């Protein structure tokens, strides 16, 4: 009788231990990793980013419980923040920032996430990223490229958001052009007027020595020319000389 009781107790203990092994402890990263392994879920950046793409925050939480580094990029160079920002997925973007993700990162093309967001033109996303960048202590001077992109693509609303965040509106790009030059070169009236109303220098020269009005004249934009002249813009002697040649 005693042997039977001992056997039953041993069987019960074995069953209990087996049950413990199958139970995941969300507070134990190793336990969560064992669970993922058992479920044949790869504990990789590619997998985590795919969850971000599909807005699966439950699975993302599982990875974070297993001590996944939230900013890791997938094989294509995009991390979860880059993907969420590009797709305009505010739910996932907020989730990521609330769980410690950084905004001051690059995407798979080597562009800063804020620059890509400005190019996409999603105001809500841009505002959220700017808030996060401020929390991270990123200087507003680092937003110069985003301003150039907004001016180049004629996104006056993006210029306004960036200006409100303290971004420099007169930073010269590597090509020698300022935002006002790009706005005019590409015929972006609203972007140009926003910059003028913000008090930028309308007679600043580009790296080639041409003024803003020179570019408006060269490209043939009557509406822009009229507004620039009203704001006090002038042509340069160099432009008249070169245009005759």
Describe each region flagged by the PLM.
Residues 1-4:
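Positively charged n-region of N-terminal signal peptides that target proteins for export
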Residues 9-16:
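Bacterial N-terminal signal peptides
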Residues 20-45, 57-58, 65-75, 91, ...:
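Ankyrin repeat arrays, specifically the small/polar loop and inter-repeat linker segments at the C-terminal end
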Residues 50-55, 83-89, 116-122, 149-155, ...:
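Ankyrin repeat A-helix N-terminal signature
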Residues 108-111, 115-116:
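Acidic (E/D-rich), amphipathic helical modules within compact regulatory domains
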């Amino acid at each position: 009788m005693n042997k039977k009781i001992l056997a039953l107790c041993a069987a019960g203990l074995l069953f209990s231990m087996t049950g413990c092994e199958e139970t995941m402890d969300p507070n134990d990263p190793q336990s969560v990793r064992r669970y993922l392994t058992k479920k044949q879920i790869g504990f990789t950046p590619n997998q985590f980013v795919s969850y971000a793409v599909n807005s699966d925050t439950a699975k993302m939480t599982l990875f974070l419980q297993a001590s996944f580094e939230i900013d890791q990029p997938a094989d294509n160079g995009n991390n979860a923040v880059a993907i969420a920002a590009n797709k305009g997925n505010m739910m996932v973007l907020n989730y990521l920032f609330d769980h410690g993700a950084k905004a001051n990162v690059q995407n798979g093309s080597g562009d800063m996430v804020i620059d890509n967001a400005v190019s996409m033109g999603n105001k809500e996303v841009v505002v959220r990223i700017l808030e996060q960048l401020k929390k991270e202590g990123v200087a507003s001077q680092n937003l110069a490229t985003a301003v150039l992109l907004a001016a180049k693509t004629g996104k006056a609303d993006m210029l306004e958001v960036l200006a409100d965040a303290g971004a420099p509106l007169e930073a010269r790009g590597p090509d020698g052009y300022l935002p006002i030059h790009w706005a005019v070169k590409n015929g972006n009236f609203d972007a140009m007027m926003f910059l003028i109303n913000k008090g930028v220098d309308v007679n600043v020269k580009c790296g080639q020595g041409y003024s803003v009005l020179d570019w408006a004249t060269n490209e043939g934009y009557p509406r822009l020319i009229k507004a620039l002249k009203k704001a006090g813009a002038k042509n340069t002697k160099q432009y008249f000389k070169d245009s005759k040649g």
